[in-house]
């Protein structure tokens, strides 16, 4: 193996060595990098029993960059002492020297210098002793010469505290002769070529044995973002439960479908510019189902269907305002309206997973854009008990079995419930979703039969993803700060399997 001179030198030294060789000492003797000797050792190991190599770990001391500078030029305090003439030096001038600030305090501690605050030109620094011994420099030079063991532990700790010395673990090999030791070794073939087969030369050539423990080359392919992996799992759960996916391709929505159709009054705080992104162009939606619009207007302003309404002047121009949808319930309203137009009524299950937009303050857990998961069931005689049963089935498929329900308020559902789950990592109950039964004031103007009820629930996609993958800042999951390596390395998502550890749960 003439193409590797370090390997040849290793074999020659080993031939005459008594017992064996240390790889680090050999590297020093040959004047080469230790890694070059390690490479030669591993090449010989691959040839079989030519050598035996025992990996050893030893602690050693190395100088930091600052430590090397001090070993060469002296400590900061010594440099400060040498810079002070016999007549003294103004303290302000001393502090502007490269080693002034650090060296001044150390020299004062060593009682090498003193400060005269009564000087006419301001505080003045004078020498206290005629000469000094730079012990710090001497100790560092000992370490540099490989004699760190001559230093007392207290002296080493002092140098470490000043960040002049660091402890490292040096991994070396003790190399000795193997059963098949020889100074002349031939390179083993790594591949069987067509030429070897046709000429028959393969019979006389040594081949490198297969390493079945070696990792294969990772396939060069695209990688799904963790959000897409979790989204796929949620989608699969809905499909297993017999749901149909709603179209959610209209990010731009009219205020009518986003608010009014949901029996949300036009004076509601959520419709304020501080919470919603309104469009400048096009500012208004021109096409609305006017018959349905009139029924919604009457329900808001006058009441109906057993409700008193909100008793205010409902304005069409307010309902026409375009916005970035604040929830996918707008898509649910469209789907239910389309369902109401089909006669006779047919029970249906719908779901959607898509982006929504809120004009919120950005922080570690909130973005102006996020994903909402929503499930809707329309059927005859559905009650709150049906909703709780469906929620238990849904969250059980997510691996969440401990649930609690708390009464809540939503403008378009009554009764409404917040869903809580016991978080094993945080050791407390945390909110995982919102739910309710759609109000008759929302459903009957659409044209749905009076004995039809609609139950619905929703949750965000980002929160379970952050918990699943141990992410505690949403900006590390979405946006320009995302680490692409995280996308490459994130495992396949299984929502029915516990997250990685309680520590990652606490972080999320």
UniProtKB/Swiss-Prot annotation:
Q: Which GO terms label this protein's molecular function in UniProt? A: ATP binding; magnesium ion binding; phenylalanine-tRNA ligase activity; tRNA binding
Q: Keywords in UniProt for this one? A: Acetylation, Aminoacyl-tRNA synthetase, ATP-binding, Cytoplasm, Ligase, Magnesium, Metal-binding, Nucleotide-binding, Phosphoprotein, Protein biosynthesis
Instruction: Quote the EC number.
Output: 6.1.1.20
Compartment annotation: Cytoplasm
In this chain, Mg(2+) is annotated as bound at 414
Q: Which domain of life is it from?
A: Eukaryota
- Locate the N-acetylalanine modifications and list their residues: 2
A biological process term (GO) from this entry: protein heterotetramerization
Q: Which CDD domains match?
A: PheRS_alpha_core (cd00496)
Where mainly found?
A: cytoplasm
Q: Which reactions is this enzyme annotated as catalysing?
A: tRNA(Phe) + L-phenylalanine + ATP = L-phenylalanyl-tRNA(Phe) + AMP + diphosphate + H(+)
Q: Which family does it belong to?
A: Belongs to the class-II aminoacyl-tRNA synthetase family. Phe-tRNA synthetase alpha subunit type 2 subfamily.
Task: Check the record and name the NCBIfam families matching this protein.
Answer: pheS (TIGR00468), PRK04172.1 (NF003210)
Q: What PANTHER family does the database record attribute to this sequence?
A: PHENYLALANINE--TRNA LIGASE ALPHA SUBUNIT (PTHR11538:SF40), PHENYLALANYL-TRNA SYNTHETASE (PTHR11538)
Name it. Phenylalanine--tRNA ligase alpha subunit
What gene does this protein come from? Farsa
């Amino acid at each position: 193996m003439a193409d590797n001179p370090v390997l040849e030198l290793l074999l020659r030294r080993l031939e005459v060595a008594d017992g064996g060789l240390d790889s680090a000492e050999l590297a020093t003797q040959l004047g080469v990098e230790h890694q070059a000797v390690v490479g030669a050792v591993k090449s010989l190991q691959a040839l079989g029993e030519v050598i035996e190599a025992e990996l050893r770990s030893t602690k050693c001391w190395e100088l930091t960059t600052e430590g090397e500078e001090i070993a060469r030029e002296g400590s900061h305090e010594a440099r400060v002492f040498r810079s002070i003439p016999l007549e003294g030096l103004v303290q302000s001038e001393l502090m502007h020297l490269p080693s002034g600030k650090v060296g001044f305090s150390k020299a004062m501690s060593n009682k090498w210098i003193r400060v005269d605050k009564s000087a006419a030109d301001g505080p003045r620094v004078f020498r206290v002793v005629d000469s000094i011994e730079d012990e710090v420099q001497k100790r560092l030079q000992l370490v540099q010469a490989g004699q760190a063991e001559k230093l007392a532990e207290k002296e080493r700790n002092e140098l470490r505290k000043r960040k002049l010395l660091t402890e490292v673990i040096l991994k070396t090999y003790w190399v000795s002769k193997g059963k098949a030791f020889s100074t002349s070794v031939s390179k083993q073939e790594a591949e069987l070529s067509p030429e070897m087969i046709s000429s028959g030369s393969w019979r006389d050539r040594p081949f490198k044995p297969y390493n079945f423990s070696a990792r294969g080359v990772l396939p060069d392919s695209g990688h799904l973002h963790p959000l897409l992996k979790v989204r796929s799992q949620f989608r699969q759960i809905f499909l297993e439960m017999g749901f149909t996916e709603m179209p959610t391709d209209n990010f731009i929505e009219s205020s009518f479908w986003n608010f009014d159709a949901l029996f949300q009054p036009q004076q509601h705080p959520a419709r304020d510019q501080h919470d919603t992104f309104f469009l400048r162009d096009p500012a208004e939606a021109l096409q609305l189902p006017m018959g349905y619009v009139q029924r919604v207007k009457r329900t808001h302003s006058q009441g109906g269907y057993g409700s008193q309404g909100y008793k205010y002047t409902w304005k069409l121009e307010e309902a026409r305002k375009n916005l970035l949808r604040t929830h996918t319930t707008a898509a649910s309203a469209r789907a239910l309206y389309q369902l109401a137009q089909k006669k006779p009524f047919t029970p249906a299950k719908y779901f959607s997973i898509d982006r929504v937009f809120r004009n919120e303050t950005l922080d570690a857990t909130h973005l102006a854009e996020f994903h909402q998961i929503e499930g809707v069931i329309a059927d005859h005689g559905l009650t709150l008990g049906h909703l709780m049963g469906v929620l238990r089935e849904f969250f059980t498929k997510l691996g969440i079995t401990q649930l609690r329900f708390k009464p809540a308020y939503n403008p378009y559902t009554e009764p409404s419930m917040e869903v809580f789950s016991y978080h094993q990592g945080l050791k407390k109950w945390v909110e995982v979703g919102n739910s309710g039964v759609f109000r008759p004031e929302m459903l009957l103007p659409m044209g749905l039969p009076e004995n039809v009820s609609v139950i619905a629930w929703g949750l965000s996609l980002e929160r379970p993803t952050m918990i699943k993958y141990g992410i505690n800042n949403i900006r590390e999951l979405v946006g320009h700060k995302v680490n692409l390596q995280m996308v490459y390395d994130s495992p396949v998502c299984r929502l029915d399997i516990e997250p990685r550890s309680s520590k990652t749960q606490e972080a999320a």
